[in-house]
């Protein structure tokens, strides 16, 4: 066999040409201790706060503490396989999650990986989990209504697009029910909903998802789940993942609604992380920056100015209280950050008033300017009437001989309370809410026993749907009641009164 010099030189020339001169440089460190989802890493001198780290087995982490000789990081995932001595790589990136319309209808974990068994999410768009909230110039005051479909809220504690309205109450008082009803009520509208479940049982999350599917609400909803069995770092980061997904729609000029269920559990997860990172504890053993934990999250929900696309992100954070104590650390923090609160009371809940909203303690600081004019016209005196009724009812327990005016006020108040009750998963359109509240305020239900008012309401809606559809449509479109329409409504209610038998 003859070896030709030209062939050899050709092969060498070809090899030299194909030789890649790129050298991949990655800064790596070594794990010196690990446990409870926290790793301490030596040798990552160039790490940035919040930077994404790569652990063995494709697991990621996030830099939280930058100390003199080591870095404290939270592991975003299962850490049982990671051990001391393993090497960790810096990625040079801040933690990012997938965003965009491809996520709608999906259930994802705290870092955006699908967990619903429907295959991968096809999106090339990613958003940084930690970004600064929009500045003052980019914002606009809240002026469009965000309908919840719940009579008690839309009439007395109205919510606007871009508002942050806290839902607060003890366990088992219907906080999640209010949030889920609000999502269901957005059906057929232009709002994308994001439900973030933090520290809940998996069975509960599965139940919520199946209810949303049953009512066709998953068609415009994203569910982010960091359940009770997930490590604390994932429960801490889940709300930020959710708000990043919501910001995509807000910044595209669309409208989004995000529900954090609930932020008490996120605060507990963050307390766990902070104590393990040896940060000094403060009140109730929470770290000093637990206020900033929630304020930087909730400030990202806002109404954007017309120059920036006029989109909005509305937030409904949920906080669980212990035995009705709203003066605890986390509840007071979140009350001071949000634009109002819906306070749910267990006593009302158990006495059959559902949604169990305490009208005296619930308030919407900015929603009034966003309320539909027709609702403002009929529900203006509702809050005062109910507050007076509660006071009067408490006083009337001690005296039996009440004058006629007091008896009438008590009877009207009891009927108003009854009219504002509503079954779960049955949101009511705004124009129908206006009708029933108008009827109650103008004495059309005073002659009927309280027990028959549920039937009165159902039959009233059916009557207007079938025989007064034009009036209903007019009320829906005009969103205000003029004198002519008021006359028509009264005439229609009189007509219905003749037909309805208690």
UniProtKB/Swiss-Prot annotation:
It catalyses: ATP + H2O + 4 H(+)(in) = ADP + phosphate + 5 H(+)(out). Gene3D superfamilies: 2.40.30.20, ATP synthase alpha/beta chain, C-terminal domain, P-loop containing nucleotide triphosphate hydrolases. It is found in: Cell inner membrane. Keywords: ATP synthesis, ATP-binding, Cell inner membrane, Cell membrane, CF(1), Hydrogen ion transport, Ion transport, Membrane, Nucleotide-binding, Translocase, Transport. It is a peripheral membrane protein. GO terms for molecular function: ADP binding; ATP binding; proton-transporting ATP synthase activity, rotational mechanism. ATP binds at residues 169-176. Its EC number is 7.1.2.2. The record marks 362 as: Required for activity. One of its GO terms (cellular component) is proton-transporting ATP synthase complex. Coiled coil: none annotated. Disulfide bonds: none annotated. It comes from the Bacteria. Signal peptide: none annotated. Produces ATP from ADP in the presence of a proton gradient across the membrane. The alpha chain is a regulatory subunit. Belongs to the ATPase alpha/beta chains family. F-type ATPases have 2 components, CF(1) - the catalytic core - and CF(0) - the membrane proton channel. CF(1) has five subunits: alpha(3), beta(3), gamma(1), delta(1), epsilon(1). CF(0) has three main subunits: a(1), b(2) and c(9-12). The alpha and beta chains form an alternating ring which encloses part of the gamma chain. CF(1) is attached to CF(0) by a central stalk formed by the gamma and epsilon chains, while a peripheral stalk is formed by the delta and b chains. This is ATP synthase subunit alpha. The gene is atpA.
